Regions:
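A short, well-ordered alpha-helix in the C-terminal region of glycosyltransferases
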Residues: 155-168, 177-180
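Conserved acidic donor-binding segment of nucleotide-sugar-dependent glycosyltransferases
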Residues: 126-127, 131-138, 147-152
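Short alpha-helical donor nucleotide-sugar binding micro-motif in glycosyltransferases
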Residues: 81-86
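Conserved donor-binding/catalytic core segment of Leloir-type glycosyltransferases
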Residues: 6-24, 30-33
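Nucleotide-activated donor-binding/catalytic signature segment of Leloir-type glycosyltransferases, i.e.
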Residues: 43-47, 53-77
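Aromatic "clamp/platform" in nucleotide-sugar-dependent glycosyltransferases that forms part
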Residues: 94
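Short hydrophobic beta-strand element within catalytic cores of glycosyltransferases
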Residues: 111-114
Length: 193
């Protein structure tokens, strides 16, 4: 077991502070899992879902794959173990700016699947470090999960995730972005005087 999860199965991870929050798209996640199993019944034997967050038990019974409701976890080390155990992270948010959960998954080398909404398409480079599904499209969400789990090169995805975080979301990268914005603002101010 990895973080209380089976190590002989592929793991689909869903994370939210409150998994029943409609904005997090749980209904689309449940529908996409149903479609995934209907199109690829063999996945029922080798794939499970881990749900991290409050009210995870309420959702686990709705899924057509075996589910591990992990509840709310605050211990950082345990959270990292859970992310690192996953093969794909799915965030079907209906509205989100720059979700920390995608950064957290990528920092653990886990590719993400999410809808084309808000800042998600800026974080996930389609079919490079994850899959960007059409907005509110459970079929495409299912296709994204299948692509990551069965078609893509897992090592390439992992490497691309780690590179994306290092280049875009590390403290150094963020500081450099702030310096660039500051320099542009100062140049504009001097220009307009």
């Amino acid at each position: 077991l990895r973080a209380g999860l089976p190590d002989d199965k592929k793991i689909i991870l869903f994370v939210s502070q409150k998994v029943t929050d409609e904005r997090k798209g749980m209904s689309f996640f449940v529908e996409a899992i149903d479609k995934l199993v209907a199109q690829h019944p063999e996945m029922k034997e080798n794939t499970v879902v881990a749900i991290l967050g409050g009210h995870s038990e309420d959702v686990a019974e709705k899924l057509s794959l075996p589910a591990f409701p992990l509840g709310y976890v605050s211990d950082e080390k345990t959270i990292v173990q859970i992310y690192s155990s996953a093969d794909v992270f799915v965030l079907p948010s209906l509205e989100d700016n720059l979700p920390n959960t995608i950064m957290e998954a990528m920092a653990c080398g886990v590719p993400s699947v999410g809808f084309k909404v808000g800042g998600i398409p800026e974080m996930i480079d389609h079919q490079k470090n994850g899959y960007v599904a059409n907005y509110r499209d459970a079929d495409d969400l299912a296709q994204g999960m299948y692509w990551v789990l069965e078609e893509a090169d897992a090592e390439v995805l992992k490497s691309n995730c780690l590179q994306k975080v290092a280049h875009n979301y590390s403290q150094h990268a963020v500081a450099m972005n702030y310096i660039e914005v500051y320099n542009q603002a100062m140049a504009y101010k001097n220009y307009s005087l």
